[in-house]
Design a protein with these regions (language model features):
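Conserved SET/PR-domain catalytic core that frames the SAM/AdoMet-binding pocket
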Residues: 341, 431-432, 442-456, 553-558, ...
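Extracellular/periplasmic, surface-exposed regions of secreted and cell-surface proteins
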Residues: 1-37, 48-377, 535, 539-639
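Glycine-rich, aromatic-lined ligand/substrate-binding cores of catalytic
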Residues: 437-474
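Aromatic-residue-lined binding/catalytic grooves and analogous aromatic/hydrophobic interfacial grooves
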Residues: 384-386, 437, 448, 594, ...
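Conserved small-residue
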Residues: 218, 225-230, 328-440, 471, ...
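Intrinsically disordered, compositionally biased low-complexity regions
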Residues: 44-45
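Extracytoplasmic gating/loop element in the C-terminal half of outer-membrane beta-barrel translocons
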Residues: 162, 466-570, 574-575, 593
Length: 639
């Protein structure tokens, strides 16, 4: 259960000149989870057998959270004459978060129908408690100035302190500055643009923000007593008695501070034809420094892993475009209005610093593009055993019979020309036949909408999508691999008929008999996509999926009855409507599988997905709860 309450107060101290506002938010969470397990005995027979569960248990967990947020803001707008506009804002904010957890566990339910710790006889029990807290306080200001609403400048800054950092680096200063020029108000452009140019504004800005989104206590050496919660939950015995103990704490980083994101932006706002057409363009570059990540390697003799700290940096370049057109006309004597709006944006991010001396490809490295996928190149499918024997050695793929290639197997490309498939040491300097085959980051994202209205009939729709994105199904994507994952899995509908190779094994030289049908699925080998070092567990461009998509996010059709008709039945308004969401989706990957939702394929459900490292192209198994189709019919009555 979560309860939230917000209060706000605004004082207009000097009318239209000085205003003071304050707000206070309190959010409380109280959650309890009980888990009971009872004894059971498997039926033992010729078909089914199993291991009995000889013990019963009861577990109780409680979670208590309290969050407070408050701020005070003052705004001064002095009168500086007709052509000058100045606004000064200053404020203070505070956040405080406290979480407490408790867990009680015991074995031995005497009465399973009445679970209670007082009705248990087990010797094994444990009690645990924990929690965390953090606080943040900040001071901020913003100064806006405009001359003739033609030349604009703004300065803003934040000075924030967080309890998550040590005293020497607790505070961070994050300034921003921007300027704008409304060219359309210049007399010299008005004289030449006529009535077609409504607004033209150029913008430039540079600003920084801080990020403290890490767990608290990372800069402290923390220890806990192991075994103190239960007399049976310790392996240390002194004087014939079990006693609690603790361990040497992990190392703490030598640098711990705010992550800093600095963005440089230039943009343009354009309106034409009495504001019927508008266009906005932005070009930006973002630098993220002091990223919280793993630190430099330490000698193995030290006996401790490297602590995480502010050791990495990232750069992102991108652009955003949006256009809008709206107008109206007479159609069959009735007013017809319409509007069309479209947006397109893209960005790419690269690692500019990261501790990875060996260039290990299983983690981040300097120069890496976020989301890149390393894998094997392929050149179709082997048509015969003879062709497979002439290809590179497949001894690298140790998966049962897959010590060599056969007819119907993928034809991997030996990029380094050494006569065998390999991954080398999986480093930048020695990566064998691996190469970059794709990228899982969404690119060329877009949306566009249409709105029409005529004679009380309204129609609107919103489409959205991603123009470029790759996804490789990981080992446990059973809904993609089917029997190539495990023999007892279902055969997917895309793996039937001529979409799968058919192999004639009547001679030693096996031959694929349906190569003319261009089958997508190779010879079926159970666990080829699951077992360690199976040939399909390694990313390859044959099974790399194009996860771009287009989706109809919203469709609304409505009819508003004429006002005269409404008045005759005692109403001031009557409207019928239908709204549908996620009604249509198309993706190139649907040619091979329609078991996944491309919009959420990389987010994943923690109950199913084995997510590895998202930035490294390992997006897990794609088991995400899909975006549901919804249909809504409604009526609006106004009295």
């Amino acid at each position: 259960m979560t309860i939230s309450s917000t209060s706000a107060l605004t004082l207009d101290i000097i009318r239209n000149r000085l205003k003071l506002s304050a707000d206070f938010t309190y959010r409380a969470g109280r959650h309890v989870r009980d888990k009971m397990e009872n004894k059971y005995t498997y039926w033992s027979g010729t078909d089914v057998s199993g291991t009995d569960k000889a013990s019963s248990s009861l577990e109780n967990k409680t979670y208590k959270t309290d969050y407070i947020s408050t701020s005070v803001v003052g705004t001064l707008t002095p009168g500086l004459g007709r052509h000058n506009r100045l606004s000064i804002m200053a404020g203070w904010n505070l956040e405080d978060y406290v979480q407490k957890t408790a867990k009680t566990y015991r074995q031995g339910n005497l009465y399973p129908s009445k679970p209670s710790f007082t009705l248990m006889d087990g010797d094994y029990y444990s009690t645990e408690s924990g929690g965390k807290s953090w606080g943040l306080v900040g001071f901020f200001t913003r100064v806006d100035y405009a001359l003739k609403d033609r030349y604009m400048a703004e300065f803003s800054a934040r000075y924030d302190g967080s309890s998550k950092f040590p005293t020497r680096s607790k505070w961070g200063f994050f300034p921003s500055v921007s300027a704008g020029w409304r060219i359309s108000d210049e007399p010299w452009i008005r004289s030449c643009s006529g009535q077609c140019l409504s607004n033209l504004k150029l913008r430039v800005s540079v600003g920084s923000l801080g990020n403290a989104n890490i767990d608290p206590y990372q800069y402290l050496e923390t220890m806990r007593a192991t075994g103190s919660s239960s007399v049976a939950n310790t392996t240390i015995v002194l004087n014939g008695m079990r006693v609690p103990y603790t361990s040497v704490p992990n190392l703490v980083p030598d640098n711990m501070t705010w992550e800093k994101v600095t963005t440089y932006n230039i943009g343009m706002d354009l309106s034409m034809f009495a504001h019927k057409f508008s266009f906005t363009a932005d070009l930006y570059r973002r630098r993220t420094t002091d990223l919280y990540t793993v630190g430099p390697d330490l000698p193995h003799v030290l006996g401790s892993s490297a602590p995480s700290g502010n050791y990495a940096s990232l750069k992102t370049s991108g652009w955003e475009l949006s256009a809008d057109w709206h107008d109206s006309m007479r159609l069959s004597g009735k007013r017809f209005s319409y509007s069309v709006k479209a947006m397109l944006w893209d960005s790419r991010s690269y690692v500019t610093s990261y501790y990875n001396a060996t260039g290990d490809l299983t983690t981040y490295y300097k120069g890496m593009e976020i989301g890149e996928i390393w894998g094997f190149k392929t050149d179709g499918i082997y048509a015969s055993n003879a062709e497979a024997e002439a290809g590179p050695s497949y001894s690298f793929f140790k998966n049962g019979e897959m010590f060599r290639a056969y007819a119907g197997d993928l034809k991997f490309v030996d990029l380094d020309g050494d006569g065998k498939m390999s991954v080398g040491n999986r480093t930048l300097s020695d990566h064998g036949d691996l190469t970059i085959i794709g990228n899982q980051s969404p690119r060329l994202q877009y949306s566009f909408g249409i709105s029409l209205n005529w004679n009380g009939i309204g129609l609107s729709m919103l489409w959205q999508g991603v123009g470029k994105r790759d996804w490789y199904p990981w080992t446990e994507s059973g809904f993609f691999w089917g029997k190539w994952n495990r023999a007892y899995n279902a055969l997917m509908k895309s793996q039937t008929g001529d979409n799968r190779v058919k192999v004639d094994k009547s001679s030693d030289n096996w031959i694929v008999t349906n190569m003319d049908k261009r089958p997508y699925w190779t010879r079926m080998v159970s666990l080829a996509a699951n077992r360690n070092n199976g040939p399909l567990t390694w990313e390859n461009d044959h099974y790399l999926q194009d996860a771009s998509y287009i989706r109809l996010k919203n469709l609304t059709l409505d009819y508003t009855f004429p006002l005269a008709m409404c008045r005759r039945i005692g109403l001031s308004g009557l409207k019928l409507y239908f709204t549908g969401e996620n009604l249509f989706t198309w993706s190139p990957m649907f040619r091979h599988t329609d078991m996944f939702d491309p919009e959420v394929i990389s987010s994943g459900d923690s109950d199913f997905e084995n997510t590895l490292t998202p930035g490294l192209g390992k997006t897990g198994n794609g088991y995400s709860y899909p975006m549901l189709k919804t249909y809504t019919f409604g009526i609006n009555l106004t009295f």
